[in-house]
From Swiss-Prot:
Species of provenance: Stenotrophomonas maltophilia (strain R551-3)
UniProt xrefs under InterPro entries: Ribosomal_uL5, Ribosomal_uL5_bac-type, Ribosomal_uL5_C, Ribosomal_uL5_CS, Ribosomal_uL5_dom_sf, Ribosomal_uL5_N
Membrane spanning stretches: none
UniProt protein name: Large ribosomal subunit protein uL5
HAMAP family linked to this entry: Ribosomal_uL5_B
Amino acid sequence: MTSRLEKFYKEEVVPALMKQFGYTNPMEVPKLVKVTLNMGVGEAATNKKILENAVGDMTKISGQKPVVTKSRISVASFKIRDGWPIGCKTTLRRHKMYEFLDRLINISLPRVRDFRGVSGRSFDGRGNFNMGVKEQIIFPEIDFDAVDAIRGMDIAITTTAKTDAEAKALLAAFKFPFRN
């Protein structure tokens, strides 16, 4: 069972990028490797219920249970100790990755207030894209009335592209809404 975006990649994106960049082999075309979701919850150091709610939200959004991240060092100004749980993360690959990106591009990002597109400067120089979401309530899986607090998350999209231009062309071919 392939998702709609995965089928679109094979039928539309690969031929378009082969023509645009002059690739001779379809295996040269950049592809998506993984999508990593990270939610830092600093308040979890004092209240464990907050972390449980964050894990529940991320489970609904991603479709799989996230791993609880723990602090590596003690920081007195943040009032955290080494080994305390401070967030959660999950990595999506294959079908779940394509389904998540489909929901992100077509449903969630248009629900952001005053949305003008995502910044095209958020590439890391090696063909990977990072973005942040300020509210988890933009995802349709989250019930607005059941949310205890508004939390943001980081989304990292890892590709096999060698340059930022190739990665931007790949994401633009997926109809990713870039501002510039």
